[in-house]
Design a protein with these regions (language model features):
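N-terminal membrane-insertion alpha helix
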Residues: 34-42
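Conserved functional hotspots that engage anionic ligands or polymers and/or phospholipid headgroups
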Residues: 3, 12-15, 29, 41-42, ...
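N-terminal secretory signal peptides that target proteins for export/translocation
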Residues: 1-7
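N-terminal single-pass transmembrane signal-anchor helix
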Residues: 7-32
Length: 197
């Protein structure tokens, strides 16, 4: 009788060991997955921050350019400096229907492709303040082609509203690239005004 009880105890011990191993695997596998993903997440966050910095650099450069043009009298307002091509990029509604070509309905990559249809790195439309402008310097003191900004003005009254040429929506798209592939992009939109003195 004694042997029978021991065999029963040995069998229950095996079940406990299997349950403990299963529990440890249930905790360990997700933990391994999580720790292997954190470098990817950190990389994605870094690209996003770099793209934001590029967009901010574009905004700063455009602000200085606009101030200079207003100060020296080259510009008396924003009329004639708005982005209007590709056709419809500045018009939110056409005959009461949402315009699919409106810049806010396009991704950053779609906007950049629409501005450079043949993909040669040169803008195919007028009235861009900057197009894929580099601004950073790498460790060897050379221009770093990975970081660029594209900046343009949109008439915030286009497609309706009271027309005036004293304000505009300044749009700055910062991009981070690896070769020709865009790793991340950030778009800033800031309403800028011109006050006649």
């Amino acid at each position: 009788m004694m042997n029978r009880g021991r065999r029963h105890e040995q069998g229950s011990g095996l079940i406990v060991v299997i349950m403990v191993v299963a529990l440890l695997m249930g905790i360990g596998i997700p933990l391994l997955t999580l720790t292997s993903m954190s470098p990817k997440v950190a990389g994605t966050m870094r690209y996003h921050e770099e793209a934001f910095n590029a967009a901010e650099a574009g905004f700063d450069a455009a602000r200085l350019l606009i101030e200079e043009n207003m100060t020296n009298g080259s510009w008396s307002g924003f009329a004639g400096h708005y982005l209007t091509l590709p056709l419809g990029i500045d018009i939110p509604m056409i005959l009461g229907v949402p315009n699919p070509s409106y810049f806010r309905r396009l991704t950053d990559q779609e906007i950049l492709q629409a501005l450079d249809l043949n993909g040669d790195g040169t803008a195919d439309v007028p009235n861009l303040l900057y197009f894929q402008q580099t601004f950073a310097v790498n460790g060897q003191g050379q221009t770093d082609l990975r970081y660029t900004y594209t900046v343009f003005l949109i008439n915030n009254e286009a497609g309706g509203g009271l027309a005036n040429n004293t304000d505009a929506l300044l749009v700055s798209i910062g991009t981070v690239r690896a070769g020709t592939r865009v790793l991340d992009s950030v778009r800033l939109e800031v309403l800028v005004t011109f006050e006649d003195e």
